[in-house]
C-alpha cells in the first residue's frame, strides 16, 4: 500500500511512463513569458470581490519576493568572522555560531520550503504492505446469555494511548486496546548523527493503512509518529529548543516487541 501522495505527483508519474511532448519546453517558456501580461490584464480589468482577492494574492506574492531578495542579499554579505578557525576549542552547540550568514540563508530556504504546498517529504519507507481488517481486529462476542452480538473489536496490533485518554463505559466501548500492547516509548535513530535514543511518543500523526487506525493510535510498519526530542538538544536557528519531531516506524512492532523508528530531518 502506498503512502498518501500529493496530487501533483500524478503528472510526474505520467511523464516518466509516457514522456513529454516534443514542444513541452517551448510551451513552458511561452507560458512563463505570458504571465506578466496576464497579471497586468487581470489587475486592470477585474472588478468587485474578485479584484479584491486578486490584489491580496499579489500583495502576499510581492512580500515573499522581497523577503527572498533580502535573504539573497544577506547571503552574499561576507561574515565578519575570521576565515581561519580559532585554535581555542569550542563546544558542539557553538560551532555554527560563526557562520551567521549561512544560517540566515538556510533559515530562509527552510521557510520557503514550508510555504510551498507541493513540498515533498522523503521518508525511509515510501511503500508498506497492506494489513487486512481480519488481521487487525479480533471479533469479541457480547451478550448477557447468548453471546450472539459481535459488534465489538479487539485490536491485535501495538497501539499508543495518550495519558489524557479516558475509557468509555464498557457497554459502549467498541474498540478495545489491550494494556499489554500499549507502547509509550520508541527507539528513535537520528540518520545524520547515527545515534539511537529511547524517546517518549507524543502521538500518531499518520497510519498509512487507514484513517481509522490513525485515530485509534495503531503502530504498524511505516506509521508516522511524533516523538519528544527535547533530550537531544535540537535547536532552531533562532535558538529555540525543538520539542516534537516526526519519525517513521521501520520495524514490525508486533513481532519485535519494541518500536524502532527513524527521525525525519
From Swiss-Prot:
One BP annotation, GO: maturation of 5.8S rRNA from tricistronic rRNA transcript (SSU-rRNA, 5.8S rRNA, LSU-rRNA)
What is one GO cellular-component annotation here? nucleolus
Lineage top rank: taxon: Eukaryota
- Annotated region (Disordered), positions in chain: 17-91
Nuclear localization signal 2, short sequence motif: residues: 56-63
Q: Where is the signal peptide?
A: none
* Xref: Gene3D superfamilies: 2.40.10.310
Biased-composition ranges for Basic and acidic residues? 20-40
Chief location of this protein?
nucleus
Record key words, sorted: Nucleus, Ribonucleoprotein, Ribosome biogenesis, rRNA processing
Q: Where is the composition biased (Basic residues)?
A: 55-69
Intervals of motif Nuclear localization signal 1: 19-26
> Where is it located?
Nucleus, Nucleolus
- Function summary: Involved in the biogenesis of the 60S ribosomal subunit. May play a part in the quality control of pre-60S particles.
Q: How does it assemble?
A: Component of the pre-66S ribosomal particle. Interacts with nop7 and rrp1. Interacts with rsa4 (via WD repeats).
User: According to its UniProt record, which protein family does this protein belong to?
Assistant: Belongs to the eukaryotic ribosomal protein eS8 family. Ribosome biogenesis protein NSA2 subfamily.
Identification of the protein by name: Ribosome biogenesis protein nsa2
